[in-house]
Amino acid sequence: MSMQDPIADMLTRIRNGQAANKVAVTMPSAKLKVAIANVLKEEGFIEDFKVEGDTKPELELTLKYFQGKAVVESIQRVSRPGLRIYKKKDELPKVMAGLGIAVVSTSKGVMTDRAARQAGLGGEIICYVA
């Protein structure tokens, strides 16, 4: 049985891993997942990530905690396979009044809502992270 929504699976693994105070979580790797992990690392929501394996690459995310609490308070899938959500540059949402981020897939790659606004790009809203 194939996975219907691998991005939702990735976000769920992060959410469950932090709820269980895990140091790291692993999942099957894909280019989009690596791009999302890169954005999460740049924004300080995860410590690090690495891709291991040749035939079946695995993505390992090292989760981040501050004073024993998970850095990621909430992580929510927005655009999904059954209902894609696209926004123009002027319509990009501000998550928690700018405290969180929206991960956006644009024509120039995956980036935060802030970076997309500065670049004058719209795109598909993948998820909200706060």
From Swiss-Prot:
Claim: Ribonucleoprotein is one of the keywords in the record: yes
Biological process GO terms, please? Answer: translation
- Any one Gene Ontology cellular component term annotated for this protein: ribosome
* InterPro entries in the cross-refs: Ribosomal_uS8, Ribosomal_uS8_CS, Ribosomal_uS8_sf
Which keywords, in A-to-Z order, does the entry hold? Ribonucleoprotein, Ribosomal protein, RNA-binding, rRNA-binding
Q: Which family does it belong to?
A: Belongs to the universal ribosomal protein uS8 family.
Give the protein's recorded name.
Small ribosomal subunit protein uS8
Gene that this sequence comes from: rpsH
